[in-house]
């Protein structure tokens, strides 16, 4: 946590920035060996929490520490996180309690889930996934959109959705239109703008 907090402090102190945004990487695996010694020390000192809750606490404390560090230097600089769009995955696999952060003060100013799916995705269709976040997040909500998928086959979208970004050229623009009508959504991010550079067919 100290290494991360100090890195953020260096950026906020030395650069004229508007915001710090973390990507969706937290615990890299469920493997118990990666923090075996830290968890053993915790248990030996009387800790009662499961490994899963221990990890979530570590991430929560890191997020809260980063937020506090930023605000102590420049209160106008915002802090947000762009997590994976699957809330259950965030909580159970990478130990990121995104709902806690988005519902309680002192963690983030905004949340920006990576809803990198088309409307026909069989696992996480865009509209339903967006609604889930609207129903759960109470902080400022942005949505990250999948410009990089334009013109590409989506192997993990199921049979009905795998060719959606090839056949339909206006998916991202329709997503922007849809988001603009939702009171809970404050805006959107594009991943990534490099997808606009050399592809005239990009939607």
Predicted regions and their residues:
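Alpha-helical scaffolding within the catalytic cores
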Residues: 63-65, 85-100, 122-136, 171-175
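Substrate-binding cleft of secreted/luminal carbohydrate-active enzymes
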Residues: 105-124, 130-203
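Polysaccharide-binding and catalytic clefts of secreted carbohydrate-active enzymes
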Residues: 1-104, 116-117
């Amino acid at each position: 946590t100290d290494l991360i907090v100090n890195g953020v402090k260096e950026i906020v102190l030395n650069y004229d920035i508007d915001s710090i945004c973390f990507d969706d990487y937290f615990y890299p695996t469920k493997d118990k060996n990666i923090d075996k010694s830290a968890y053993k020390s915790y248990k030996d000192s009387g800790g009662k929490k499961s490994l899963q809750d221990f990890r979530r606490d570590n991430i929560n404390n890191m997020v809260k520490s980063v937020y506090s560090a930023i605000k102590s230097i420049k209160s106008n600089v915002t802090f947000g996180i762009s997590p994976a769009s699957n809330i259950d995955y965030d909580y159970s696999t990478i130990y990121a309690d995104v709902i806690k952060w988005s519902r309680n003060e002192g963690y983030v100013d905004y949340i920006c889930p990576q809803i990198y799916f088309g409307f026909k995705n069989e696992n996480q269709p865009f509209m339903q996934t967006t609604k889930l976040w609207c129903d759960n997040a109470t902080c400022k909500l942005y949505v990250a959109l999948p410009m990089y998928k334009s013109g590409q086959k989506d192997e993990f979208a199921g049979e009905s959705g795998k060719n959606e970004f090839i056949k339909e050229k206006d998916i991202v623009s329709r997503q922007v239109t849809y988001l603009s009508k939702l009171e809970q959504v404050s805006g959107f991010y594009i991943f990534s703008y490099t997808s606009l550079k050399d592809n005239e067919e990009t939607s």
